[in-house]
Amino acid sequence: MKQFSEATRVQMPAMVHLTRIGYTYFGKLSEDKNGTVYDGDTNILLPIFEQQFKRLNPEHEGEYLQVLKDIRKELNDDDLGRGFYNRLKAVSPVKLIDFDNIGNNTFHFTAEFTCKNGQDEFRPDITLFVNGLPLCFVEVKKPNNHGGMLAESTRMNKERFPNKKFRRFINITQLMIFSNNMEYDALGGIVPIQGAFYCTGARSYAQFNCFREENSSNQKIAPYNRDYRYEDVDKVVEEQILSDYNCQVIHTSPEYQTNLDVNTPTNRVLTSMCSPERLLYI
């Protein structure tokens, strides 16, 4: 690996930042864990999903496997994930997320987790899980990457969304974030050139949207980000993340330390859109 790449400049710092906002690093996932640690049809983390399902639905513990089967079926429907979304928001007869008490849910992340159906596959840079459900993924590029974020938009809209083999993974994903860790620049405010953008699933085309935190007094850092109660970084977890992705060499580099700042464009948008209270609200 080159010493400075999209992984070292954006991906690794973003993963460490997620630990500051309430996420637990799940560890690196490989295909040999399919069927035991995760379900390859949906990329649901099986032990976490089972544990949380039984915790949130103590009177329906025996229905865990049937619900998992139902989710598998729903995700193959050509409905842009509407069926799964309705299940996700439901509170009766069973619930997958506790929207009233955030503390009853678990939040995990991993990286380079392959979404595979037959011979077709793609691998988001970072995947976020709520109660074991892969509800969000993040794609990162290094600053000033060739083609800017327009290249990422083109890849999603021409390669991933139209591919029916990816439908199940798009249907379960509620939020997609794309960033090259730069401040916004867009042609006429429409075409994504640089910055951090988001979209939701689509059959063929999804517009990349800007996210700007409320900042009525035009402060340098928006109040939500400025006042957020970040957790301290656990150095052992940080070292594990870097080790899992062969990035130990960057640990003491000035560039890596700079990109760990909570107020980089990527880290700001993660706080704004993926902090547990915000993600469940969105």
Please tell me what each predicted stretch does:
Residues 1-282:
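An alpha-helical interface "stripe"
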